Amino acid sequence: MSEGRTDGDTWGPAQSVGATATMVAAARAVASQGPDALLDDPLAEPLVRAVGLDPFIRIVDGKLDFPDDPLFNRRARAEQITVRTRFFDDFFIDATEGGLRQAVILASGLDTRAYRLAWPAGTVVYEIDQPQVIAFKTDTLANLGAAPTAERRTISIDLRDDWPAALREGGFDVTRPTAWSAEGLLPYLPPEAQDRLFDNITALSAPGSRLATEHVPDPNAFSDERLARISERWQRLGLNLNAADLFYRGERNVVADYLTGKGWRVTPHPARQLYARNGFEFPEDEMRATFGEMSYVDATLTGGRG
């Protein structure tokens, strides 16, 4: 890729932003392998194979590894995706145990939570993503004989468009508290679209709604140096992707502060603490150099709609 993002650009699971979703699914597949598997996502591997990108198939098959890379070797990548996946899994489990029966997975990609989590009876799970991505995953999992464990409703729309209207048209109930996830999404939105995303979530959320996302307190987290580090790793995989072409740069509002200002009670979970909680050693120097001081965020809407 030699050109940056444009308004209205689209993709499937093998192109552009979609290929990074497949990369994440490949990591989940690796973390789900073997007798000492860190995750249990049996649908990740067949989805990756169905996409058909050779580097990710080689990763899943154990034929491609970078043992000298403290962040990108097979074990480190499995631990990194395990920390992230368990955080969002636990978020949804806790939210539904607290009585929430409506969930929205923003930029759902090849996420399989609607198929693999034990959702309580009556739970409705909405998935929002690009039409090509939604169609690919739905058709592939149907061909595999996989069935959702909740009522799954798909909303095929770009998050830069009027997705709130599409969500309501899909049956979303604004009177019910909702569990929202925005996982691995924010760098792919322009700074103003990030704010608009949280504004829309707040406007659609009844009191008691919850939100999980990532949070980098540095408003200039995606510097040229950090993007170059990410791109170098992608290109070592054999992917002709440049992070500077996919991520939107520019100063952003700090997620935790912005949500607090919208009436959310925000609890940050620093990545290093989640690594320790999972029994993993945190790759301190390399993680900070590449991603900054990243935290995961669990927020609860305490008041009325903003």
From Swiss-Prot:
Q: Which GO biological process entries does UniProt record here? A: methylation
Main EC class the enzyme belongs to: transferase
Annotated S-adenosyl-L-methionine binding lies at 129, 158-159
Keywords for the protein's UniProt record, in alphabetical order: Methyltransferase, S-adenosyl-L-methionine, Transferase
Its EC number(s):
2.1.1.-
Q: Which GO terms describe its molecular function?
A: methyltransferase activity
- State its role: Exhibits S-adenosyl-L-methionine-dependent methyltransferase activity.
The text of the family note is: Belongs to the UPF0677 family.
What is the name of this protein?
Answer: Putative S-adenosyl-L-methionine-dependent methyltransferase MAV_4442
User: Whose protein is this, by species?
Assistant: Mycobacterium avium (strain 104)
